[in-house]
């Protein structure tokens, strides 16, 4: 590995590789195609960024609209997280990069591509649009990374991914990372990876030993929000998952009314709102994030101590991916599933398929000693999260703004000055 990349890792306190990094780096740095299987939080982002940057370092600059490397990810949040990890590595190697995703105007992205971006980090849909408009050309790609391929399949992106991979040169290096190897992902591997070396570490198919799994059997639906508020009021970061965007919005607002600084994350939010809410959660201004399943893959936040499934997910894969928000990189974490009487059968099937044996506790009301055990510490309810909105500086008293409507009494003052002059 180039010494300047080592220096970046040391600066960020990274001195020992995770299992997935130790397994894949020798092959990926040697230029081989790699299939890496590892759960979220296993360190796979650096497992593909390091060989990508090492391969491009010292090479020719990218031509306008023709990147040398492509990273595909399923969500805007994940693209931004990868961008944050890539930025210092790219700077050390003298590489430029450009993110490409929907939900924002395309003009800045087009400008970045025209300047000649070495690395493009993209969601499939917007990248296909820019290629169709001839703003991007993948014929010079040397290395392609497909991150969270199983999530791409879940979201129906595989046809677009196949078209994009077909647009990259045959024989170029390809790295594919996935928590599971489902049928759709397996088709990608067979079609686009040449004699791939397969490495598996911390598979999402197996129980996660670092997590404590609990099921709270609620006797009535009206206990759901009080129980959530009690858990979220404990010290530390909490991520709450719901099945629907409407549910995420409602839970976040009800937690806010209960004094919990909570933000929501789902597909109905504008990109600016998503960024603002994630930054509030990162900074600690909001201690609870309420998200939908789609957002589960894009949230990379350290020190999440508690994950709560306010709505049990529909399948075990979603349970494992949601739960991966805690116990990241070997840290401990607690996962709680709220279960209503009509959900007992589904939750039992879910946990059985996930390969876990949770501790189940029945709650006949909104309070129970188990809540303090699952989320220990003194409860704090400082109030709902209020987004920070920049305001213009106040003007000294008597100083005008140039807007007649904002200067009540100005005519009276003119009459007074005129009278004084007379």
Language model segments and positions:
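Conserved pre-motif I regulatory segment
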Residues: 1-37
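Conserved nucleic-acid-binding Ia/Ib motif block in the N-terminal RecA-like helicase ATPase lobe
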Residues: 5-7, 14, 62-132, 140-143, ...
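SF2 helicase motor core recognition
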Residues: 291-307, 322-330
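Walker B catalytic acidic pair
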Residues: 124, 148, 292, 303, ...
């Amino acid at each position: 590995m180039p010494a300047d990349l080592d220096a970046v890792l040391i600066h960020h306190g990274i001195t020992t590789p995770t299992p997935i990094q130790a397994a894949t780096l020798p092959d990926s740095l040697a230029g081989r195609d790699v299939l890496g299987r590892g759960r979220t939080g296993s360190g796979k982002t650096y497992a593909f960024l390091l060989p990508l940057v090492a391969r491009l370092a010292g090479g020719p600059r990218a031509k306008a609209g023709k990147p040398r490397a492509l990273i595909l990810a399923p969500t805007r949040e994940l693209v931004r997280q990868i961008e944050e990890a890539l930025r210092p590595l790219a700077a050390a190697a003298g590489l430029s990069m450009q993110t490409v995703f929907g939900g924002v105007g395309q003009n800045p992205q087009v400008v970045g591509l025209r300047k000649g971006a070495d690395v493009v980090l993209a969601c499939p849909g917007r990248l296909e649009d820019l290629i169709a408009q001839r703003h991007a050309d993948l014929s010079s790609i040397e290395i392609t990374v497909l991150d969270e391929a199983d999530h791409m399949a879940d979201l129906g992106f595989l046809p677009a991914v196949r078209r994009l991979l077909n647009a990259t040169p045959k024989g170029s290096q390809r790295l594919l990372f996935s928590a599971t190897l489902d049928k759709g992902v397996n088709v990608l591997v067979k079609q686009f990876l040449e004699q791939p070396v397969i490495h598996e570490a911390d598979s999402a198919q197996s129980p996660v030993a670092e997590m404590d799994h609990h099921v709270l059997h609620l006797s009535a639906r009206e206990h759901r929000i009080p129980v959530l508020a009690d858990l979220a009021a404990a010290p530390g970061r909490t991520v709450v998952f719901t099945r629907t965007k409407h549910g995420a919005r409602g839970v976040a607002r009800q937690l806010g009314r209960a004094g919990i600084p909570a933000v929501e994350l789902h597909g109905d939010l504008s990109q600016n709102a998503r960024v603002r809410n994630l930054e509030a959660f990162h900074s600690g201004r909001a201690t609870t994030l309420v998200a939908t399943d789609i957002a589960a893959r894009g949230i990379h936040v350290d020190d999440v101590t508690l994950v709560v499934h306010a709505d049990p997910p529909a399948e075990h894969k979603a349970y494992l991916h949601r739960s991966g928000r805690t116990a990241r990189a070997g840290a401990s974490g607690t996962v709680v599933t709220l279960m209503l009487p009509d959900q007992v059968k589904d939750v039992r099937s879910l946990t059985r398929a996930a390969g876990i044996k949770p501790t189940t506790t029945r709650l006949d009301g909104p309070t129970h000693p188990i809540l303090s055990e699952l989320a220990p510490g003194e409860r704090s309810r400082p109030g709902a999260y209020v987004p920070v909105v920049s305001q213009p500086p106040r003007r000294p008293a008597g100083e005008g703004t140039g807007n007649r409507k904002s200067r009540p009494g100005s005519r009276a003052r003119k009459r007074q000055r005129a009278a004084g002059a007379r």
